[in-house]
């Protein structure tokens, strides 16, 4: 949780740069900034131009108020930050980076201050509009990778603490794929537009008490299914034949550009879920086995 501070969010920002909200005209420079940082920091994944264009399309988190871009005297983007928050959510999420050549000058600290103040403002706005579950305590959640010690030092110095770890697991596809059969009455089908809404509802149900998860509305789900890297041909849904109810789903993506830099190609399972009433029937195992077969057939090295 973050305490109260009575200031405009932009007052937190470092005056070495000129600050403005991100817009369509900034897409190339914004993407180039993130790519420069990624070349040095080597994250597992980073946002590219198409991802940033999707961010600008959000109506739940309008870019004019929820993004900030810092440019130098030549107009080159050197730092950015953004937050997202669901209207009835109990937290905001913060994202950002500083050009490696401009780090160590207090710019990241200023961005963090901006994120915190925007989080306070978003919670206050939700409370003013009568959202019952917004909660009185503003909370900002940040993510970092283990090798990014400079980020850890910044966050810890500002009073943040580690609350959750995530692991990314890989499996070679050349060593054979396990067999996993669905029981009678269940059917595996392709994931297409006709199932988008049913899978959204199934996902919200499956993750309703999962740590840190919040329901996804139509806009948020649209960003999932229309993600620039989304691969519906590598995804699948399990249906209960008698009712047509979604019994499980596996939504996958493929980062062809990232594969070139990593030296191997992979199919990535972004979301895997089984609603409660269908658990314990081997559905997740069958979906993962199907995903590996799809990835292998597409010529990928790993899952």
Each model region followed by its residue ranges:
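Acyl-donor-binding surface of acyltransferase catalytic domains
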Residues: 1-11, 84-184
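A generic N-terminal leader/anchor concept
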Residues: 1-29, 273
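A short beta-loop-alpha structural element at the N-terminal edge
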Residues: 18-30, 187-201
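Conserved donor-binding loop and adjoining core beta-sheet/short helix segment
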Residues: 25, 34-123, 131-133, 144, ...
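Ligand-binding pocket scaffold of soluble enzyme catalytic domains
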Residues: 57, 67-68, 80, 122, ...
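Active-site beta-strand termini and strand-to-loop segments that position acidic
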Residues: 71-73, 171, 239-241
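Conserved acetyl-CoA-binding loop-helix of GNAT-fold acetyltransferases
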Residues: 104-121, 270-274, 280-297, 302
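Phosphate-binding active sites in nucleotide-utilizing proteins
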Residues: 207-257, 272-274
């Amino acid at each position: 949780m973050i305490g109260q501070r009575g200031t405009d969010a932009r007052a937190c920002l470092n005056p070495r740069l000129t600050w403005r909200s991100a817009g369509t005209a900034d897409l190339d420079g914004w993407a180039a900034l993130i790519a420069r940082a990624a070349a040095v920091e080597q994250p597992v994944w980073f946002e590219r131009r198409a991802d940033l264009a999707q961010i600008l399309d959000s109506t739940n988190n309008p870019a004019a108020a929820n993004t900030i871009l810092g440019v130098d005297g030549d107009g080159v983007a050197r730092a950015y930050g953004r937050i997202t928050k669901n209207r009835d959510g109990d937290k905001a999420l913060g994202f950002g980076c500083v050009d490696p050549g401009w780090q160590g000058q207090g710019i990241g600290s200023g961005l963090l201050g901006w994120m915190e103040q925007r989080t306070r403002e978003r919670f206050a706005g939700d409370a003013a509009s009568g959202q019952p579950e917004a909660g009185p305590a503003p909370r900002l959640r940040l993510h970092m990778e283990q090798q990014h010690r400079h980020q850890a030092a910044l966050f810890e110095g500002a009073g943040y603490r580690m609350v959750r770890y995530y692991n990314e697991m890989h499996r070679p596809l050349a060593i054979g794929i396990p067999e996993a059969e669905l029981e009678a009455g269940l059917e595996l089908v392709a994931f297409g537009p006709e199932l988008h809404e049913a899978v959204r509802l199934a996902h919200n149900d499956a993750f309703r008490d999962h740590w840190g998860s919040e329901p996804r509305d139509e806009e948020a789900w649209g960003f999932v299914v229309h993600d620039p890297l989304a691969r519906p041909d590598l995804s699948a849904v399990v249906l209960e034949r008698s009712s047509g109810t979604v019994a499980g789903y596996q939504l996958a993506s493929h980062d062809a550009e990232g594969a070139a830099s990593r030296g191997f190609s992979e199919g990535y399972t972004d979301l895997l879920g089984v609603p409660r009433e269908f658990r314990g029937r081997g559905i997740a195992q069958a979906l993962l086995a199907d995903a590996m077969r799809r990835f292998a057939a597409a010529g990928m090295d790993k899952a």
